[in-house]
Regions:
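Gly/Ser/Thr/Pro-rich low-complexity, intrinsically disordered segments
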Residues: 1-233
Length: 233
């Protein structure tokens, strides 16, 4: 994030880490849409017990009419990204659901966002706690550790379309601060007035800069090189 702050000539007062990526390779495995162009997509396939699953994972988007929301999304093999009102009901260890399409798991809506970031799981949707880490295949094997305490990053929106950027420390970098799990984050974001909210990459990636200054201590002792970020202009 500090490199982004410097490269963008300090024009973003708030910068926060974004979606998931392959460490070392710099490849995003979360959706990224900027100025209406999809630059990366959410993971299209996850392998569990030698079976292929096709999860609908979360995105946080700004529509072209100026409203923020969380949605479950999937990009098909022909390159079309659809959003859905409900996630595909996958569960690791059970028979995989069909690959999402224009009509499954619900009627899909073609992504028409001004900007969007992928992550997951979705924590809140339409004012209700959802925490769909099971359906999105964000299990322990994914590395997200949804039920364990770690540094976390999330983004949400209130009923009056105000965006909430959220980070928390963890792993006892500050004595006694162990972090949060997904259930705790969902409740905290709801208490802050969010009606929609989504988890982003956490752990050693968690970082927020306000006017170039970090607001929490990184769990690894220094900022991690990340692939995507969310910034307030």
């Amino acid at each position: 994030p500090n490199q982004i702050w410097q490269a963008e000539q300090q024009k973003y007062p708030i910068i926060m880490n974004g979606g998931y990526f392959v460490m070392g390779a710099g490849k995003s495995v979360s959706l990224l849409c900027r100025e209406g162009e999809v630059l990366a997509v959410n993971s299209q396939e996850e392998i569990r017990s030698q079976k292929s699953y096709y999860p609908t994972r979360g995105i946080f988007q700004l529509s072209k009419n100026g409203y923020f929301s969380t949605d479950w999304a999937y990009t098909t093999t022909d390159g079309v990204t659809y959003t859905y009102e409900q996630p595909s009901p996958n569960k690791s260890g059970y028979e995989p659901q069909p690959a999402p399409s224009a009509y499954f798991p619900t009627r899909g809506v073609k992504l028409n966002a001004e900007t969007a970031i992928g992550g997951g799981p979705i924590l809140l949707k339409d004012g209700s706690v959802r925490n769909t880490f099971i359906e999105e295949l964000f299990d322990e094997e994914s590395g997200v550790a949804p039920e364990s305490y770690h540094p976390r990053t999330a983004i949400g929106v209130t009923a009056n379309n105000k965006v909430i950027f959220f980070v928390c420390e963890g792993r006892s970098v500050t004595e006694g601060v162990k972090g949060m799990n997904m259930a705790m984050m969902a409740n905290v974001l709801k208490s802050l007035g969010c009606v929609d909210a989504m988890n982003l990459d956490g752990g050693g990636s968690t970082c927020m800069l306000v006017n170039g200054q970090p607001v929490i201590k990184p769990s690894a002792g220094a900022q991690r090189a990340i692939t995507t970020a969310v910034a307030l202009k």
